[in-house]
Amino acid sequence: MGDGLGVANLLAVLHGVGAGAMAGFVSGLLGVSPGGILVPAVCLTLGVDQHVAQGVSLIAQIPPTGLGGVSEYRRRGQGVPMPWIALLSAGFIAGGACGAVVAGYLSDRALRWSFVGYLLVLAVLAASRGRKQSTSMSEEPAVAPRRVALVGIGLVAGLSSGVLGIGGGLAVTALSTTLLHFGQHRAQAMSLILTLLPLTIPAAGVYVAQGWPLPWWSIAGVIAGLWGATAIGARIANGLPERVLRPTFVVLILAMAAYMASKSAQ
């Protein structure tokens, strides 16, 4: 990490805390893994390139920083069966390792535009689900989801995690509401529970092995910010109706896509 906590390292920690707190709050509020916010936030606050930002994001998501947020969702009755989490995790681990290897062969510009395209697809899926649900009173599936569907969602989330350096929660939330017909609160709870498991280790290990210059003091700050802010966001989310949460989720995705598109166009 360097030789002691000098002024430069202290600033790196504080910048990391700011990026982590921003990502953690949104993670708890919208039930997504923090990586989708963390990557652009790290690029903005630390001024690093896309590969380094993705490495920071993946490493910072190894500790169970979303524990407070998960507790808030469970306290409001939004539990998720552990067999579902196990199936998601199996797909995620396989996809994450493969995705990180692929990312190593892509340029920063290609990664950024891939990030933008991925976000736009998720926004369309989430918005489509919102329109369909407005005509139905049911917010939860009548039967348990098929195993292959959960593994498949985990695989897509893992691939996005490895290639784009995010936690995959955006994919879990968007796909579980669209394909499995989960209510927004249940989908967000499932996504956050997934963040408690150190599923980004394989992808993070690839980034470290490839020798990217990772800012370890900033990573420590990011972890601290994530830990403190996720529960606050989750507490607010549980007091909001679904008709508010879903449009907020879509707006967030579009805002992230717009920011990354502006970075890519420079």
Where are the predicted features?
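Juxtamembrane transmembrane-helix boundary motif
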Residues: 1-25, 33, 37-51, 71-164, ...
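Small-residue hotspots at the loop-to-helix junctions and early N-terminal turns
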Residues: 50-58, 188-192
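Membrane-embedded alpha-helical segments of transport systems
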Residues: 59-67, 94-95, 102, 193-201
